[in-house]
């Protein structure tokens, strides 16, 4: 395990600046004294686009490659046309760094606002494919803007891409106590892509006899996320279904404000990126109202990815304890929550 961390920091837009500052505060507090943390901040996002028209210049993309990991705050602003930052920055990073795993843990923490509160058995992970599906830009339109317009959005699925994400999901399931993996797709209608996923899943399953498996159509999975979340341990699915399911998973386990995520390159060829799921919330930016918990939990994912398991667990324990003590009667600022978590992980 490396005894130094070279971290790229992209605060981004809106509340991103505030929550990233708290994530770094907790990171500095939890690391052992013999671990050297170096950070470099990158000015990317809406303000940069307004000033220069740049989203992610090639020079900065090249510089980002040299870091061990990336911590991202939030990207997006209503003053920027939809899709400019999403495709020009976030998706460009994801594809350039081959982040083929989007990792989204879903765990019910104590004292959280959800209709499923009081069910301690909600603890699963969604492994979403990150570089294929309908997000590759494979499509187009004819006779655009006319009553006869035709639009296509093609979902790209390759045997190579599917197998590597399925294999990663089996590895994660094998390392967890329950050792269960569920494939989610819609192979009764999406027969070509669906059969590629199911056949690959079944082939790889033969190499992991210790992992129990099952399959669900995506519509059934959405029902069970709400009615039987305890049935899930690790879930693997494609890019589009995963995008939808992970937000539902966040809702049933306490809300997007507590949801962390990792865009992972498991090979280590490129740095992985970790970020809270929530948006930039420009309506509350700069007011100290943003809860940095999701960013702090993203820091835990980052540490675990880099091999700092004990430190990651301390952050998660601190978050659990902090949430358990919240009663809603006193509103704390962003800084106050970050300070409290930093004290807990350092003690």
Swiss-Prot record:
Record localization: Cytoplasm
Site (Important for catalysis): 135, 186
UniProt GO MF annotations: 3-isopropylmalate dehydrogenase activity; magnesium ion binding; NAD binding
Binding site for Mg(2+): 219, 243, 247
Stated role: Catalyzes the oxidation of 3-carboxy-2-hydroxy-4-methylpentanoate (3-isopropylmalate) to 3-carboxy-4-methyl-2-oxopentanoate. The product decarboxylates to 4-methyl-2 oxopentanoate.
SMART domains reported for this sequence: Iso_dh (SM01329)
Principal localisation: cytoplasm
Gene Ontology BP annotations: L-leucine biosynthetic process
Originating species: Streptomyces griseus subsp. griseus (strain JCM 4626 / CBS 651.72 / NBRC 13350 / KCC S-0626 / ISP 5235)
Protein name: 3-isopropylmalate dehydrogenase
Gene transcribed to yield this protein: leuB
Quaternary structure and interacting proteins, as annotated: Homodimer.
Residues passing through the membrane, by range: none
Superkingdom as given in the UniProt entry: Bacteria
Record-listed substrate binding positions: 94, 104, 128, 219
Cofactor field: Mg(2+); Mn(2+)
